[in-house]
Amino acid sequence: MPNTAAYAQSDYQVRLDWGGAGLERLAPAHIVVVVQTLGLTARALSACERGGVLDLAPGAGADLARAAAGAGAHVVVGGLRNAAAVAAHVLDRQRARGERTSISILALGAPEDPGTDATRFAVDDLLGAGAVIAALGDLGIDHASPEAAVAGEGFRALGGAVRHLLTASGAGRALAAEGGRDDVLVAATRNAASVVPVLDGDVFRAA
């Protein structure tokens, strides 16, 4: 699918797409927020909350983050646990730039097959992306594409049920079956983290 005006969402300040293919479809943005609620987001927040850093291990999240940074974007990790902090960070960056700043939200989803760009829809990542979009809207950054607006308003409507939705989702059930139920419950806590992991070279560190 070509990166044309029909798919690039370039008319909008806040954009949403899925995975590495989504990054290629979207118009270049000043800031890219990577969301993988039970994967990269959870690992990056855990490391940064402890005062450490998260090395970029091989995988879809690392590849997407590097590609976004290579295109000149400021890359951060966001989701349910730090949506408000991410929105505040974006607003600070916009104020520092002195002009409207474009934001692409990239939900990673679940890879269908290793080594391909095929992505399976993941409700946990849709919720995380929606949380960030809703938080941006709360700060007046609300010129959102239809794709982003639907995710943000969907989160507003269902945000009170996040714990149930996450634990009952396919990804949540799979992680719980592997002994990670507590990790799912932690990931479902809204705005419990004030840290924003920012890509700095090959690591994510707290902003």
Question: Language-model segments: which ranges?
Answer:
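Actinobacteria-biased recognition of intrinsically disordered, low-complexity terminal regions
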Residues: 1-12, 207
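Residues that scaffold, gate, or flank divalent-cation-dependent active/transport sites
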Residues: 12-31, 37-88
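A short glycine/serine-rich beta->alpha loop
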Residues: 29-31, 114-120
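Short hydrophobic beta-strand segments
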Residues: 30-35, 102-107
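Short glycine-rich anion-binding loops that position phosphate/pyrophosphate groups of nucleotides
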Residues: 38, 110-111
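Long, charged alpha-helical interface segments
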Residues: 59-77, 88, 97-101, 117-207
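Short, structured patches in soluble enzyme cores that scaffold and shape functional sites
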Residues: 79, 105-110
